[in-house]
Each structure stands twice: as C-alpha cells, then as structure tokens.
Amino acid sequence: MTSSDEELKELLKQATTYKQDPRHRIPMVDRPSKILTQSNKCRENKARKCSNCTCNKNTNTNNTIYKSKCGSCHLGDPFRCSSCPYKGLPPFNEGDEINFDEL
C-alpha cells in the first residue's frame, strides 16, 4: 500500500469515529421501541384516589344515589331540608327510585 492509501484510510477512520465530550452528553435512544409516538404522548391519565382521600375526586357523580340528610325527603316539601334535590317534587314512597331526567 502506498502512503496516500494509508493517509486516506486514516482520514476515513477519523471521519467515522466521533469522540463525544462526556460533559455535553445527549441521551441517545438505543432502540426505536423507546421512542414515543404521538398516540403515546396523548394518553389520558387516570384519576387516582389519594390515600386518606376526603375530596371524593375519584367517585362518579352521575352514578351516586342521593342519600337524604334529614331522612324525611319522601314526606314532601314542608319536611325537606334546604339543600334537598327533591324540592318541588310531590311526596313519594320511601325507597322509590326517582329519575330526574324524566321530569
């Protein structure tokens, strides 16, 4: 081999090797499976209940059944408390299912 071939090989070797300064290291992804796609980035987080929860954030308000504070909501308006959701409705039998959507 001639000296020019050796010089070219040396230049090629220097051009293809990259010495990175560890102080300026950028984390590299070694597998394409670790790259987040747009669908992975946009996932909704589940609402998690905290320990000793008092805010009831995790409960579904649509499926909760109202429980009377005073216990006399079925008797009619004169016996209902001020925050009663049954206010304005006629008296009903205790234990009857009341659907507000039909009103």
UniProtKB/Swiss-Prot annotation:
Renumbered ranges of motif Cx2C motif 2: 81-84
MF terms in GO: 4 iron, 4 sulfur cluster binding; metal ion binding
Annotated segments matching region Disordered: 19-103
Region listing for Fe-S binding site A, in residue ranges: 42-55
One Gene Ontology biological process: iron-sulfur cluster assembly
One Gene Ontology cellular component: mitochondrial intermembrane space
Domain of life: Eukaryota
KW Nucleus (keyword) present: no
Keyword Signal listed: no
Chief location: cytoplasm
Localization: Cytoplasm; Mitochondrion intermembrane space
Motif (Cx2C motif 1): 70-73
One Pfam family recorded for the sequence: CIAPIN1
Annotated keywords: 4Fe-4S, Cytoplasm, Iron, Iron-sulfur, Metal-binding, Mitochondrion
Start and end residues of each stretch annotated as Fe-S binding site B: 70-84
Binding annotation for [2Fe-2S] cluster: C42, C50, C53, C55
Domain statement: The C-terminal domain binds 1 Fe-S cluster but is otherwise mostly in an intrinsically disordered conformation. The twin Cx2C motifs are involved in the recognition by the mitochondrial MIA40-ERV1 disulfide relay system. The formation of 2 disulfide bonds in the Cx2C motifs through dithiol/disulfide exchange reactions effectively traps the protein in the mitochondrial intermembrane space.
Assembly information from the UniProt record: Monomer. Interacts with TAH18. Interacts with MIA40.
PANTHER family (UniProt xref): ANAMORSIN
Protein name: Fe-S cluster assembly protein DRE2
Organism the protein comes from: Enterocytozoon bieneusi (strain H348) (Microsporidian parasite)
Name of the gene this protein is made from: DRE2
